[in-house]
């Protein structure tokens, strides 16, 4: 089996622009990618592909096969799937809370397709046992789309429900979850820039100062 990680560095995570500069965000996504790759390897996956619009965006310390493709996310992933005959795990690069035990549980399932839903109807992880005929449809309510695609092909579906695996880091409040529950270098990076602000409501992040830190 193989894992594939779609990855974009340039001007990434624009919804974090209220709390991070562009350079900080680009560094942050690099560290999240490193965490995801490390987790995959810890979970027993050795064959890892990273699909990116610019191969130069992936640092040399990322031990994975780099595929450069500047087409739409769905187009490049569907092309990738059409060329594979082994089980494929598609995992997003902004999931530093995923643990190796999640990966082990996901790939151990017997269903044809295992889906890890993300916030707001998204899809964070897809495990497809027979990828050559499966086509993905990200954006919008992709969780529902992928369930429908699997059902139309008479494929068995497993929904893997996990708070940590479902928490992608897109918005400032997500960084709170990373600081509270994380375990890797992305958490370390966030902790150097934010503290926890507690009150009567939910815990929030609070920048240590307003001067950009690199």
UniProtKB/Swiss-Prot annotation:
The keyword Transmembrane does not apply. One of its GO terms (molecular function) is GTP binding. One of its GO terms (biological process) is F420-0 metabolic process. Keywords: GTP-binding, Nucleotide-binding, Nucleotidyltransferase, Transferase. Gene3D superfamilies: 6.10.140.50, Spore Coat Polysaccharide Biosynthesis Protein SpsA, Chain A. It catalyses: (2S)-2-phospholactate + GTP + H(+) = (2S)-lactyl-2-diphospho-5'-guanosine + diphosphate. Pathway: Cofactor biosynthesis; coenzyme F420 biosynthesis. It is an enzyme of class 2 (transferase). It holds the Pfam family CofC. InterPro entries: CofC (IPR002835), Nucleotide-diphossugar_trans (IPR029044). Its EC number is 2.7.7.68. It comes from the Archaea. The keyword Nucleotide-binding applies. Homodimer. Guanylyltransferase that catalyzes the activation of (2S)-2-phospholactate (2-PL) as (2S)-lactyl-2-diphospho-5'-guanosine, via the condensation of 2-PL with GTP. It is involved in the biosynthesis of coenzyme F420, a hydride carrier cofactor. Belongs to the CofC family. This is 2-phospho-L-lactate guanylyltransferase. It comes from Methanohalophilus mahii (strain ATCC 35705 / DSM 5219 / SLP).
């Amino acid at each position: 089996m193989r894992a594939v990680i779609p990855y974009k560095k340039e001007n990434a995570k624009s919804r974090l622009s209220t709390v991070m500069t562009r350079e900080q965000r680009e560094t942050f996504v690099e560290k999240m990618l490193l965490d995801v790759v490390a987790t995959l390897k810890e979970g027993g996956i050795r064959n890892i592909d990273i699909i990116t619009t610019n191969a130069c965006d992936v640092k040399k310390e990322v031990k994975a096969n780099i595929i450069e493709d500047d087409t739409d996310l769905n187009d490049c992933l569907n092309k990738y799937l059409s060329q594979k005959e082994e089980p494929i795990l598609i995992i997003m690069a902004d999931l530093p809370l995923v643990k190796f035990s999640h990966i082990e549980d996901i790939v151990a399932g017997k269903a044809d397709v295992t889906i890890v839903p993300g916030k707001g109807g998204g899809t964070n992880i897809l495990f497809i046992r027979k990828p050559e005929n499966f086509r993905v449809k990200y954006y919008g309510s992709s969780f529902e789309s992928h369930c429908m695609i699997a059902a139309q092909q008479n494929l068995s579906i497993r929904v893997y429900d996990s708070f940590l695996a479902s928490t992608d880091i897109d918005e400032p409040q997500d960084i709170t979850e990373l600081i509270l529950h994380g375990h890797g270098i992305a958490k370390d990076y966030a902790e150097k820039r934010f503290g926890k602000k507690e009150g009567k409501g939910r815990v929030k992040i609070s920048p240590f100062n307003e001067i950009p830190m690199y």
